[in-house]
């Protein structure tokens, strides 16, 4: 589908959202574009500096959302890069069952829509940045890419891409034993960062954090791990 950030469907409470997550507001030399895709399913936000040297698409991690990437957004803007972010299905402000996913191709399909939006409305070259699951989505997009079409990204930058999670063998075994009668489990907030204040914010202050994790994500992860292991060698440079 053709995804376009639609100014006719603004994000309710956007100013409060930006303040709460300490994201850059619009200024005289910084344009902020925010809205939903045409199907109203996905929230998209873009920051464009007065002089732009290219556009970065940021793909967030599992159970993350745009609001948690303020430091990265500001760093990219300081480099005169336009930043385009979106909340994946079931994450942040986007619609869908919280964090439920049957196949990573659902995330890749939405990424393709965002790429089309960037190519139509923002300056090139185009760069991809992916954190954890977001890194996996960018890799899957790369290995599934049709070589007849020019590859859209000038660079790929992956931050701890999700390729084989810690404790995966046990998680996988438990999933296949219980998937027919356990559809979600209580979320355990792990020490995923050295920043204790950030971890405390996730646990007790961020209203967009899910408290339960759908078990279907394990099945989707299992499919992805198998696909990655069996994929052909690719010489594209990744940073």
Feature locations, PLM:
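Short beta-strand/loop motif that positions the catalytic acidic residue
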Residues: 239
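Active-site nucleophile elbow and catalytic-triad environment of alpha/beta-hydrolase enzymes
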Residues: 213-236
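An N-terminal hydrophobic leader/cap segment in hydrolases
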Residues: 1-36, 40-48
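Alpha/beta-hydrolase-fold enzymes
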Residues: 129-217
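Conserved alpha/beta-hydrolase
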Residues: 73-97
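Short beta-strand element of the alpha/beta-hydrolase
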Residues: 53-61
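Catalytic nucleophile-loop/oxyanion-hole region of alpha/beta-hydrolase
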Residues: 62-68, 92-122
């Amino acid at each position: 589908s053709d995804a376009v950030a639609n100014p006719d469907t603004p994000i309710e409470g956007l100013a409060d959202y930006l303040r709460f997550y300490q994201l850059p507001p619009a200024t005289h030399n910084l344009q902020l574009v925010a809205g939903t895709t045409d199907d109203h399913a996905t929230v998209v936000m873009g920051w464009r500096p007065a002089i732009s040297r290219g556009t970065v698409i940021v793909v967030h991690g599992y159970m993350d959302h745009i609001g948690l990437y303020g430091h990265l957004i500001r760093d990219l803007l300081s480099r005169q890069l336009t930043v385009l972010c979106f909340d994946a299905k079931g994450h942040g402000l986007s619609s869908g069952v919280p964090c439920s996913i049957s196949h990573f191709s659902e995330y890749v399909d939405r990424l393709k829509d965002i790429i089309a939006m960037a190519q139509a409305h923002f300056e090139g070259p185009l760069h991809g940045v992916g954190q954890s699951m977001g890194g996996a989505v960018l890799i899957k997009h790369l290995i599934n890419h049709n070589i007849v079409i020019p590859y859209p990204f000038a660079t790929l930058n992956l931050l701890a891409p999700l390729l084989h999670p810690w404790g995966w063998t046990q998680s996988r075994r438990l999933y296949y034993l219980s998937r027919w009668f356990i559809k979600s489990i209580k979320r355990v907030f792990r020490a995923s960062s050295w920043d204790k204040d950030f971890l405390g914010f996730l646990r007790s202050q961020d209203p967009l954090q899910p408290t339960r994790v759908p078990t279907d994500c394990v099945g989707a992860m299992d499919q992805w791990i198998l696909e990655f292991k069996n994929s052909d060698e690719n010489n594209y440079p990744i940073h």
